[in-house]
């Protein structure tokens, strides 16, 4: 709900939301829905953390989600977020088969505990938190997201540290990070359940057809 998860600052607390969209191949179809996540970042005093709200899975591969966290130039975390290195289908979508929430009709087909629903939670297995006062570097915090596919191949969503793993041979990114869209996602009976939402392309629909100006900018 908006009153529980607002973007903004209050005293020494702050929250921010992003949508991160991935291509799962070095030769992708540029629909950027192979894995889509909604991330909530939170600062409270000297503590910083995040949690992941899974949105869509348009990949037939075993996809694993990872993150790299920096404070300034100091890397404080790099790794996969799933317990036991479980893939995204297992960890986020209860092992549901097929494409999830990527259909051309834009109909939600995700099932949680056997019921079709568009709302998933920020999963406890994805939550991470650090006490930044223990890090000597006084630079800003940033998080760079990646997926692991095809064994140990890592594809990044616009990483400054892993540029060669962020762009394909055509110079197109393997992932997009969308911030502060001003849009929201509403679930019947629950109200607003996702802030700063991004309407990612449907299956086999290149992002160039949906957001031509964004594509030209890329």
Model-found features: residue ranges?
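Extracellular distal adhesion/interaction modules in secreted or cell-surface proteins
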Residues: 1-218
């Amino acid at each position: 709900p908006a009153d529980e998860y607002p973007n903004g600052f209050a005293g020494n607390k702050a929250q921010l939301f992003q949508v991160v969209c991935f291509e799962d191949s070095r030769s992708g179809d540029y629909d950027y829905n192979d894995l889509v996540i909604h991330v909530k970042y939170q600062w409270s005093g000297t503590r910083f953390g995040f949690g992941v709200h899974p949105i869509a899975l348009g990949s037939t591969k075993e996809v694993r989600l990872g993150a790299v966290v920096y404070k300034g130039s100091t890397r404080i975390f790099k790794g996969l977020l799933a317990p036991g290195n479980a893939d995204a289908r297992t960890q986020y979508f209860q092992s549901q088969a097929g494409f999830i929430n990527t259909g051309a009709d834009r109909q939600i087909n995700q099932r949680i505990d056997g019921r079709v629903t568009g709302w998933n939670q920020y999963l406890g297995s994805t939550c991470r938190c650090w006490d930044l006062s223990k890090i000597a570097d006084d630079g800003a915090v940033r998080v760079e997201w990646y997926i692991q596919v095809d064994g140990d191949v890592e594809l990044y969503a616009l990483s400054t540290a892993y540029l060669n793993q962020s762009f394909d041979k055509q110079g197109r990114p393997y992932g997009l990070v969308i911030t502060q869209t001003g849009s929201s996602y509403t679930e019947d009976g629950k109200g607003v359940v996702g802030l700063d939402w991004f309407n990612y392309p449907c299956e086999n629909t290149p992002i160039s057809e949906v957001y031509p100006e964004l594509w030209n900018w890329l």
